[in-house]
Amino acid sequence: MPMRALLALFLLLPGLPAAALDLLPTTLQLPAEGGRTELWLHNPGPERWQGEVQILAWEQQLDAERLQPSDRILASPTRLDLAPGARQRVWLLPRSAVPVAAEQAYRIVLAPGRSSLPRYSLPLFQGAAAPSVRPAVRARVESNGSQTHLRLDNPGRLHARLDGLSFESVGGHRSVLLPGLAGYVLAGRERRWTLPARRDGYLGGRFRARLQDGREVVLDAWDPSIAVNPPAGL
């Protein structure tokens, strides 16, 4: 059954008014060599929903998400007008048929015509979605004295979607840090997330999370043991 777009990475405006949309799927995939994929919209509310589809190239830096308008992905239609109860299919396809050498990440944004309504953002990835390839995300805890951060590195060629992030202490006690969607680490990128304070500073334990295929994995440490303070020069 459809999931509210709140299950996407973020809902750009707070609150979920009556004019919300159902979106399916909430993660989109295009093959490396082209092809197309479809996004279905459903307006279950009593009001008409009008807006447009925007395509944004998605890049990540250590502490920031970078979104820029892109013409590499085409949407059809781009203008949306859904009466109450109506459904609409949006086709998404690459402008070029040349295969991409590395996974490309985008955000598909549904921007309403009324500023009082929420904008929705869904991830789209173009590249080989090999089910046998598991993202190899590495984790390190960093502390600057006032804040503690979890630094994640994804050296692989496939993005990592992390759900249910938890920490398991040396004694085996598990603490849930983020029960739902924790976030994404794009292929070849690093991200840093703030952690809640902990008396032992996360010393000696390990982090667990579920990947996009539903498997729970241990996030490998960059060093033989996860240290609170990173070595000099990192």
Model regions: which residues?
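Sec-dependent signal peptide recognition
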Residues: 2-9
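Intrinsically disordered, low-complexity Pro/Gly/Ser/Thr-rich segments with frequent PxxP/GP/PP motifs
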Residues: 62-98, 172-201
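Terminal connector regions
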Residues: 95-137, 199-234
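Intrinsically disordered, low-complexity segments enriched in serine, threonine, and glycine
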Residues: 144-234
